[in-house]
């Protein structure tokens, strides 16, 4: 069995997960550090956590194997990676799958965790973005002075977003 962890900002439609359904346990955890690292409005935290619970319930309803750690769990205040470590030990997991982690600090922390625990980590391109990291790095390597406007113009042209048939932008201006 493998583990697929889903972070709170990765509540993507089920079609992105279906191919992992049969051989993965899906792990989600409400995280104390995420709720407290910055002062957030209580309703924002409530919305965030209720969205996660709803997504986990949806996965369970669709016959996914889900392990979910709630705010009332004795593990709630433990570091997120301690929660992951607990499940990989109890389920004898050697391989983890996830979407790309957008938070660079947490991604680096997770890479170190994977290395330290001798795990295989399969990273999937995040459906959160139109462009892959490789495409963006390719753009940066080709432009001495990168500008987001130039990058997005190229992306619109490549993906034909808000473009007329003649190659000009809808509305006439970039």
Annotate each predicted stretch with a short phrase.
Residues 71-72, 101:
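Short strand-loop junctions, especially beta-strand C-caps/beta-turns
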């Amino acid at each position: 069995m493998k583990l697929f962890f889903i972070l709170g900002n990765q509540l993507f439609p089920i079609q992105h997960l279906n191919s992992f359904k049969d051989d993965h346990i899906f792990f989600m955890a409400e995280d104390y550090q995420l709720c407290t690292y910055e002062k957030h409005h209580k309703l924002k935290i409530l919305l965030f956590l209720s969205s996660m619970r709803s997504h986990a319930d949806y996965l369970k309803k669709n016959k996914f194997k889900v392990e979910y750690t709630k705010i009332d769990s004795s593990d709630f205040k433990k570091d997120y990676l301690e929660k992951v470590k607990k499940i990989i030990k109890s389920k004898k997991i050697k391989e983890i799958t996830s979407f790309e982690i957008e938070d660079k600090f947490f991604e680096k922390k997770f890479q170190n965790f994977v290395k330290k625990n001798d795990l295989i980590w399969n990273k999937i391109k995040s459906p959160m973005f139109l462009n892959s990291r490789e495409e963006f790095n390719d753009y940066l390597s080709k432009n001495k002075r990168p500008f987001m406007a130039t990058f997005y113009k190229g992306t619109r042209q490549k993906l034909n977003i808000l473009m007329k048939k003649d190659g000009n932008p809808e509305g006439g201006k970039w």
